[in-house]
Curated annotation (Swiss-Prot):
SUPFAM superfamilies, A to Z: FnI-like domain (SSF57603), Growth factor receptor domain (SSF57184), TSP-1 type 1 repeat (SSF82895)
Function: Major connective tissue mitoattractant secreted by vascular endothelial cells. Promotes proliferation and differentiation of chondrocytes. Is involved in the stimulation of osteoblast differentiation and has a critical role in osteogenesis. Mediates heparin- and divalent cation-dependent cell adhesion in many cell types including fibroblasts, myofibroblasts, endothelial and epithelial cells. Enhances fibroblast growth factor-induced DNA synthesis.
The protein, known as: CCN family member 2
Domain IGFBP N-terminal: residue ranges: 27-98
Cystine connections: C29-C54, C33-C56, C35-C57, C43-C60, C68-C82, C74-C95, C256-C293, C273-C307, C284-C323, C287-C325, C292-C329
Domain CTCK: 256-330
Chief location category: secreted
Taxonomic lineage: Eukaryota, Metazoa, Chordata, Craniata, Vertebrata
SMART domains listed in its UniProt record: CT, IB, TSP1, VWC
Length: 349
């Protein structure tokens, strides 16, 4: 049959095959790398910043169900890959999840690799049966200052995220009781009453690790810098490895193992990247009587990670010196454990 005799449906099918078989725009990697100049690209919450397929530029990874090419890869941290299907010469595919267990969250079933908003405050991703969430609202901390001695977060009508407001002082000095509300623990660091070049140096405590096992995040806020400006500092933290069966190490007649001994040095992993060095790190143990064990004294050290694409990044990380076992544990149903604080006697760095 001649081309002119094709039905409209067959014409559309032939056109679709032609589009899927031709190379995607900008697919050629033979030329020199040309990346957009300026600031480092910012991706939406929960979307990874990855190296493109040509090994040139960093871009926001494609998500589940989105179109992808060899140059525009899918998000590897969510177990996604670009499924080109058939015929074999197709250059455009669809981001598909590798085989993994689905997740049940709030009565809804999500596929492995699927992202969703659990509420207006959190963006979540299902990955092989586990749900991980990142906050969509600002997690900043505002320290007391002369122009705002009593800051507090409030829920405003029509808005999802809480915002900071400044209350008027009520028979308090600027620094005393107001500052105490933000120092939930003693710290080895700058003296909060120290004046330096017209700057009242203030540093909050490190928050508890966002995860009870595996790699998490701990944060604090300080103005201990040359410009006396508030800045948020973060560090990686690992209270204990998730795969470790620590209960079997509890001695007979005891109910806790506070700081178990790790038999061999370990390498830390972060988003597919591995620490360059091995570390003989300390971790917190477990109890069989309902208590939980958390870091008591810590220090912060830089750790270098090497990624599969060759990039080397340096991150600050918490290293445990001592642990304490106690009954002040987070709730069993608290999936956002980053909101949980346990008193720690400071960072010794």
């Amino acid at each position: 049959m001649s081309a002119t005799g094709l039905s409209p449906v067959r014409c559309a099918f032939v056109l679709l095959l032609a589009l899927c078989s031709r190379p995607a725009s900008g697919q050629d990697c033979s030329g020199q790398c040309q990346c957009a100049a300026g600031k480092r690209r910012a991706c939406p919450a929960g979307v990874s910043l990855v190296l493109d397929g040509c090994g040139c530029c960093r871009l926001c990874a494609k998500q589940l169900g989105e179109l992808c090419t060899e140059r525009d890869p899918c998000d590897p941290h969510k177990g996604l890959f670009c499924d080109f299907g058939s015929p074999a010469n197709r250059k455009i595919g669809v981001c598909t999840a590798k085989d993994g267990a689905p997740c049940v969250f709030g009565g809804t079933v999500y596929r492995s690799g699927e992202s969703f908003q659990s509420s207006c405050k959190y963006q979540c991703t299902c990955l092989d049966g586990a749900v991980g969430c990142v906050p969509l609202c600002s997690m900043d901390v505002r320290l007391p200052s002369p122009d705002c001695p009593f800051p507090r977060r409030v829920k405003l009508p029509g808005k999802c995220c809480e915002e900071w407001v400044c209350d008027e002082p009520k028979d308090h000095t600027v620094v005393g009781p107001a500052l105490a509300a933000y120092r939930l623990e003693d710290t080895f660091g700058p003296d909060p009453t120290m004046m330096r070049a017209n700057c009242l140096v203030q540093t909050t405590e490190w928050s508890a690790c966002s995860k009870t096992c595996g790699m998490g995040i701990s944060t604090r806020v300080t103005n201990d810098n040359a410009f006396c400006r508030l800045e948020k500092q973060s560090r990686l933290c690992m209270v204990r490895p998730c795969e470790a069966d620590l209960e079997e190490n509890i001695k007979k007649g005891k109910k806790c193992i506070r700081t178990p001994k790790i038999s061999k040095p370990v390498k830390f992993e972060l988003s597919g990247c591995t620490s360059v060095k091995t570390y003989r790190a300390k971790f917190c143990g477990v109890c069989t009587d309902g208590r939980c064990c958390t870091p008591h004294r810590t220090t912060t050290l830089p750790v270098e990670f090497k990624c599969p694409d060759g990039e080397v990044m340096k991150k600050s990380m918490m290293f445990i010196k001592t642990c304490a076992c106690h009954y002040n544990c987070p709730g069993d149903n608290d999936i956002f454990e980053s909101l949980y604080y346990r008193k720690m006697y400071g960072d010794m760095a």
